[in-house]
């Protein structure tokens, strides 16, 4: 006779074992109709699953985050159902959920086209609208394998052979004639799966291994209702307009080409933004008392073996050989900074030492994962490493946190998600070391009044980390900043300092990055601003233009005055109508356009317009130079007249 405890503390007693759905029905028909699954003693379970012992139960509906994920997972199965009807020879691999949707990897002897996607989506909707029940059956391992062998599904058989114990009882989900295998839970009925959209097809290696066969990955999105789907598709349209690859080409910021995959060719305007970011971060390094260093981009394999990178990171490292020695191009800067620390005797009085570098790093990311500036193989980190005592951990992490928020606020990012990533399965160091490291970061977050999410097993192999994820104007999350605590690497590389008792101690090392990859951060802010960079970052801050040839000398004079004041200004003396010039430079997202006609020359002034179309009136040259200098110095986000 199980007693079921509900979220409000009330209890219901049943004479016999009872399913999640039956509990919902006992509460009310409306709740039963809305029930997708349940959370039994904190564990997600299917609506048909039986509860035979006293338990706590939360009903999961489409309004819950878990409910939406279950809908998406069930839509992946619905995709399998539909594609099997249209392409009976297709082999199904895996179909998990992802942010905002799902995908399914399939093996088909022809490339899927947009027309195929449209047909699959149409069949999915036809099937879903029949509102058929999804039937779950627990079977033996052998029965599951026999089922998929009979159905000609080699990838499902491989999953059973390699990932599931022979004593297990896998769950098979029956969608009418289609059968899939999954941990679940799934929706009880397809009435929950009416609002979806198939988006694209991409290549994906089976098990993510390039030695395996390339499969076709079908991506889709799914939502609880029509309104949510429409809003998401609208956000996607806006994201496409803001795509940094599209804007980067339109504004001539950079390009990438096949001969250098994942590596950036910076053009003048893009490199201007890059250097401005470096300059800005350097001012903060000085403010927070860092020293700037520069390490070599390549070091002997022996050093990387000592750090543990060779054993844990080799697949992502580029290597080369010379004079019978093997070298690795650095994927990160930390080992080089320890070498700098090791030069000369250090005392506890010298600590903390805060060492920063704009380090050029390379990682051999899979070609299929490369994406504009967001995922590259060569990148520059605004990296720093702090060498300190254990007693200094909390104060130093606090200083890093303040620096993170200080810098992000300059770019207008205020919605920042904080995550604490704990020890991964593949790691160096003992549990006692990891306990101290994780506790140190957690204490610093608590001391700074920050709420955070724990990401179990997501830390680096050498230490736990705090991650700072920016939420942008389209409600997307970008992980940028990190603060990592490392008790292991300094000891592996023989770093030490003389303690107060004259004994030798190993310093604690704090890894810190704020922008993360400068390349990626430029991609993020390009999309955040839609290319309308704030004045201090804009490659060209002002364009001075004439109306007729008679104003050419005056235009040059104004341009020189702006340039002499450190403002990035250009003149436009082309024989075009001024309206044409204004439109062109507006499309180029230039913050200010200065028009010089006969009236302006006579008054010794300039007429100023913004890229947003605002007419700011006339200013003397000196007035506008001073105003613009102050705006750039303040690194404000808004143009004149927008305050």
UniProtKB/Swiss-Prot annotation:
One of its GO terms (molecular function) is metal ion binding. It comes from Actinobacillus pleuropneumoniae serotype 3 (strain JL03). Residues 243-534 are annotated as: Catalytic. Belongs to the class-II aminoacyl-tRNA synthetase family. It is an enzyme of class 6 (ligase). Catalyzes the attachment of threonine to tRNA(Thr) in a two-step reaction: L-threonine is first activated by ATP to form Thr-AMP and then transferred to the acceptor end of tRNA(Thr). Also edits incorrectly charged L-seryl-tRNA(Thr). Keywords: Aminoacyl-tRNA synthetase, ATP-binding, Cytoplasm, Ligase, Metal-binding, Nucleotide-binding, Protein biosynthesis, RNA-binding, tRNA-binding, Zinc. Binds 1 zinc ion per subunit. Residues 1-61 form the TGS domain. Homodimer. It catalyses: tRNA(Thr) + L-threonine + ATP = L-threonyl-tRNA(Thr) + AMP + diphosphate + H(+). It is found in: Cytoplasm. This is Threonine--tRNA ligase. GO terms for biological process: threonyl-tRNA aminoacylation. The keyword Phosphoprotein does not apply. The gene is thrS. Its EC number is 6.1.1.3. Its cofactor is Zn(2+). Pfam families: HGTP_anticodon (PF03129), TGS (PF02824), tRNA-synt_2b (PF00587), tRNA_SAD (PF07973).
